[in-house]
From Swiss-Prot:
Name by which UniProt lists this protein: Glyoxylate reductase
A matching Pfam family: 2-Hacid_dh_C
Organism (species): Pyrococcus abyssi (strain GE5 / Orsay)
Residues spanning the signal sequence: none
Active-site residues (renumbered): R242, E271, H289 (proton donor)
Cross-referenced HAMAP family: GyaR
Disulfide partners: none
Family recorded in the similarity comment: Belongs to the D-isomer specific 2-hydroxyacid dehydrogenase family. GyaR subfamily.
Entry keyword set: Cytoplasm, NAD, Oxidoreductase
């Protein structure tokens, strides 16, 4: 009996590919750039499984071109790039990679927070460019004055795995921890000494606001002009969630006009992204969507992708199935 075919839309760590090759016929798109839409639509015609990145839109058009497709494994914790409702109707399983990238993303959130608060990027440029040497001044009491982090108030919007991991790091800085999520989490509140606050109250009280929510209809442009104006003028906004959670035009206005002190961004409304108006500001720290970019996290994601596909092939429910309603439509397996 021939092996089921899986197409992977980008090179993932070898550990995941090696696991899959034992059970599947594997094809990988090896170009650094994302796969062109027309090629993706051609590749899916005869595949049984698909491994996708956030950059690929997996929608009805893709499903219609893929009559054999039974499972889509997203190489990410988020899955807003996939039409999950349409997949479920067609009996197509959708999985993601939660858990394995939690700590890496939380680490980056704090890296952005510290870098923004303490002007690390500006200081690096000042030193590296030779400007420090040109000034001929070893130290000045008013250079690069930033904001204290220790003992301040952090407001975390979204209190799932990543939000809670950020809170754990905040405890090390003896911060007051506020959080907002759709549901209160009394046990976690007790464990992390965290306080639940309505969103607008959290924004008004926090020195640092960190976004860790999934993108959906409720969170799209959650941080808009009205809410940015609620924040302290000394507050710093960090986004490791999804770019579209923030209204970018409103954020630029806030940074320019001093409604808030600064921002640290890892995600953007469109990716890859360039915005001269935003990028010219010196009170924003920018990274190119690298929240999960550690060796350990990316290998863990690759393993979890493989584990999901292998479990499905064996007729088992994948460990991180997103659309559990699909179990009513089709049993797991390539039968």
């Amino acid at each position: 009996m021939s092996k089921p075919r899986v197409f992977i839309t980008r090179e993932i760590p070898e550990v995941g590919i090696e696991m899959l090759e034992k059970e599947f016929e594997v094809e990988v798109w090896e170009d650094e750039r994302e796969i062109p839409r027309e090629i993706l639509l051609e590749k899916v015609k005869d595949v049984d499984a698909l491994v996708t990145m956030l950059s690929e839109r997996i929608d009805r058009e893709v499903f219609e071109r893929a009559p054999r497709l039974r499972i889509v494994a997203n190489y990410a914790v988020g899955y807003d790039n996939i039409d999950v409702e349409e997949a479920t109707k067609r009996g197509i399983y959708v999985t993601n990679t939660p858990g394995v990238l939690t700590d890496a993303t939380a680490d980056l959130a704090f890296a952005l927070l510290l870098a923004t608060a303490r002007h690390l990027v500006k200081g690096d440029k000042f030193t590296r460019s030779g400007e420090w040497k040109k000034r001929g001044v070893a130290w000045h009491p008013k250079w690069f004055l930033g904001y204290d982090v220790y003992g301040k108030t952090i407001g975390i919007i979204g209190f799932g795995r990543i939000g809670q991991a950020i809170a754990k790091r905040a405890r090390g800085f003896d911060m007051r921890i506020l959080y907002y999520s759709r549901t209160r989490k009394p046990e976690v509140e007790k464990e992390l000494n965290a306080e639940f606050k309505p969103l607008d109250e959290l924004l008004r009280e926090s020195d640092f606001v960190v976004l860790a929510v999934p993108l959906n209809k409720e969170t799209y442009h959650m941080i808009n002009e009205e809410r940015l104006k609620m924040m302290k003028r000394t507050a710093i906004l960090i986004n490791v969630a999804r770019g579209k959670v923030i209204d970018t035009k409103a954020l630029i206005k806030a940074l320019k006009e001093g409604w808030i002190a600064g921002a640290g961004l890892d995600v953007y409304e469109e990716e890859p992204y360039y915005n001269e108006e935003l990028f010219s500001l010196d009170n924003v720290v920018l990274t190119p969507h690298i929240g999960s970019a550690t060796f350990g996290a990316r290998e863990g994601m690759a393993k979890l992708v493989a584990e999901n596909l292998i479990a499905f092939k064996r007729g088992e429910v994948p460990p991180t199935l997103v659309n559990r309603e699909v179990l009513k439509v089709r049993k797991p397996g390539f039968q």
